[in-house]
Amino acid sequence: MSAFFLNMKKSIITQKIIAKAFKDLMQSNAYHQISVSDIMQTAKIRRQTFYNYFQNQEELLSWIFENDFAELINDNSDYYGWQNELLLLLRYLDENQIFYQKIFVIDKNFEHFFLIQWENLLDKVIFDQEKKSDYHWSDLEKSFICRYNAAAICAITRESIIRGNSLEKLYSQIVNLLLAQIKIFES
């Protein structure tokens, strides 16, 4: 393996260690009470290393959203299929519920990012379904079903997170709803 790829791998590992330290601190502290020094002390890495990867805590937070969801949605879609991918995502959100409860309260931009991630997953649902069916979806139909359902699922999962309810319990309802809507479009 080349030095470039080794450094890149080391970089991602370091970012994940920093992100985990931040998430751990969020379990017992308010977002605004956590300093970069606190994060790096928890990570057991020198403070300056934080700034090699992130300008500030907001950038770290954005990286966490993008990285965690991308790993769950993009990295697993071909291997697991959309239904298992959905289940993995709901379980992940359940396991990290306190973190996301706090984030929803302090960061209104996260809701938009959360919506985009649901749209990405639903794009894959339609793509997967289109491969299994003779029906060819128009761009308008794809856009409608993805955006409509993403908004609904985003709102329901956000509310469940804030209330502390299990998201895994929503799994069969979400799957059944999506399959029923797909069947309507395909008929």
Curated annotation (Swiss-Prot):
SUPFAM superfamilies: Homeodomain-like, Tetracyclin repressor-like, C-terminal domain. The keyword Transcription regulation applies. The keyword Transcription regulation applies. GO terms for molecular function: DNA binding. InterPro entries: Homeodomain-like_sf (IPR009057), HTH-type_Tx_Regulator (IPR050624), HTH_TetR (IPR001647), Tet_transcr_reg_TetR-rel_C_sf (IPR036271), TetR_C_Firmicutes (IPR039532), Tscrpt_reg_DhaS (IPR012738). Residues 35-54 bind DNA. Pfam families: TetR_C_8, TetR_N. Residues 12-72 form the HTH tetR-type domain. Gene3D superfamilies: Tetracycline Repressor, domain 2. Keywords: Activator, DNA-binding, Transcription, Transcription regulation. Homodimer. Interacts with a homodimer of DhaQ. In complex with DhaQ, upon activation by dihydroxyacetone, activates transcription of the dhaKLM operon. Binds the inverted repeat sequence 5'-GGACACATN(6)ATTTGTCC-3' located upstream of and partially overlapping with the -35 promoter sequence of the dhaKLM operon promoter. NCBIfam families: DHAK_reg. This is HTH-type dhaKLM operon transcriptional activator DhaS.
